[in-house]
Amino acid sequence: MDLDVLNMFVIAGGTLAIPILAFVASFLLWPAALIRIYYWYWRRALGMQVRYVSYDDYQFCYSYRGRPGYRPSILMLHGFSAHKDMWLSIVKFLPKNLHLVCVDMPGHEGTTRSDLDDYSISGQAKRIHQFVECIRLNRRPFHLVGTSMGGNVAGVYAAQYPEDVCSLTLICPAGLPSTTESKFVKQLRELQESRCIDRIPLIPSTPEEMADMLKLCSYVRFKVPQQILQGLVDVRIPHNDFYRKLFLEIVDEKSRHSLHENMSKIKAPTQIIWGKQDQVLDVSGASMLASAIPDCHVYILENCGHSVVVERPRKTANLILEFLALVHSSDNNKKQA
């Protein structure tokens, strides 16, 4: 082989090897950094832009795509200990001309965390209302989506600020009394009885506990490498003290059944999406909401757990779009009549 040709292959091989070795080193040595880069890249690929806005001295962090148009804007509220990027799997399947806003909930990720703040469900709903006013999202009624803790907040928000919300999607929301005890609720009861409340299953501090949490939250069994589990834990550990405080706040008597206490006040057309195999919040909550909210549409997803957004992103996105089309069509018919 000609020496110049051989040198070309060596140089090309070396050029390819450098990013591969960098990736392997990051995977083995800095998995948490790799996870952050992953979210950064995914946001860019989907066209989501990150912005900050302040209400007095309180800062909100959010991502958005598109501009307000003839269809309602969509505001998405994530669950306990998550962040705005958890919605990216659904954003992938939503039209680019829809105006989407994903906000970090109070105390999470880039939104202000303060020991003096009120992290009860009603307190969080007030903060989200401040955010909505800051970005003037409520110039027109918008579609509100929330999952788990975010679903609890979304339902309370729709009840307390009905003029802001034209329609509502609640994905396996918290805030309802349990008619059937889920695996998670049973674990909590056992921890309370043994006085080991610090070992909350949703607040892992080791890769093994992270694997257990993923099994609890998901019906689909994802094969997650040990290093990624370690990275997921490393990202969360600095925040675990806050997560414990927040968890005790939202399961306190003031917030535990907030959605149940407010569901009869919800006037907006409402969509309920729930995984049939949810082990965190029992699926029986769907029928409870359906019996209290006048215009309520329930969708139970087979072979799906609590992490609906991760397990069934395409289906969830399609259900939201179909529901919006139904509500939008109904509104147009009323105007024409």
Task: Map each language-model feature to its residues.
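Flexible "cap/lid" loop of the alpha/beta hydrolase fold
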Residues: 155, 159-160, 164-205
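Gly/Ala-rich beta-loop-alpha elbow adjacent to hydrolase catalytic centers
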Residues: 146, 150, 154
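Active-site loop/oxyanion-hole signature of alpha/beta-hydrolase fold enzymes
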Residues: 55, 63-64, 101-145, 161, ...
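Catalytic active-site module of serine/aspartate enzymes centered on a nucleophile-bearing elbow/loop
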Residues: 3-4, 295-337
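Conserved alpha/beta-hydrolase catalytic His-Asp/Glu region
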Residues: 31-33, 179-186, 201-265
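Conserved HGGG/HGGXW glycine-rich cap/lid loop of the alpha/beta-hydrolase fold
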Residues: 64-110
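Alpha/beta-hydrolase fold catalytic core
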Residues: 1-74, 96-98, 133, 137, ...
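Short beta-strand/loop motif that positions the catalytic acidic residue
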Residues: 266, 272-274, 278
